[in-house]
Amino acid sequence: MAITKEDILNAVAEMSVMDVCDLVKMMEDKFGVSAAAATVAVAAGPVAGPAEAAEEKTEFDVVLVDAGSNKIAAIKAVRGATGLGLKEAKDAVEGTPFTVKEAASKEEAEALKKQLEEAGAKVELK
């Protein structure tokens, strides 16, 4: 009777970690391969995935991180962007970080970021 893959898997599952490491080394020597090379190749695939996903992102949150030295200009910019009242905009600017706009398109987020940065504020797109 031949040994099945499942029999081998069950035998490996019952081994200690040290025994499995020894088995891997023996297989590397016997077949002239390296388990590390396979691991690197597998790890390289997922690394490229998130980078591509970040490029494809279509909605951004515009977050005011710091009002900068000219708070009045930052308050005016926040009011113009959000339609908040003077007190609400002042509280938002003083209570950074503050999400100015959620789920904005890339173009809208970039324009809003530029407007806030021209007022002296520090802005992040998330």
UniProtKB/Swiss-Prot annotation:
It comes from Francisella tularensis subsp. mediasiatica (strain FSC147). NCBIfam families: L12. HAMAP family: Ribosomal_bL12. One of its GO terms (biological process) is translation. GO terms for molecular function: mRNA binding; structural constituent of ribosome. Keywords: Ribonucleoprotein, Ribosomal protein. PANTHER family: 39S RIBOSOMAL PROTEIN L12 (PTHR45987), LARGE RIBOSOMAL SUBUNIT PROTEIN BL12M (PTHR45987:SF4). The keyword Ribosomal protein applies. This is Large ribosomal subunit protein bL12. Forms part of the ribosomal stalk which helps the ribosome interact with GTP-bound translation factors. Is thus essential for accurate translation. It comes from the Bacteria. Homodimer. Part of the ribosomal stalk of the 50S ribosomal subunit. Forms a multimeric L10(L12)X complex, where L10 forms an elongated spine to which 2 to 4 L12 dimers bind in a sequential fashion. Binds GTP-bound translation factors. The keyword Ribonucleoprotein applies. GO terms for cellular component: cytosolic large ribosomal subunit.
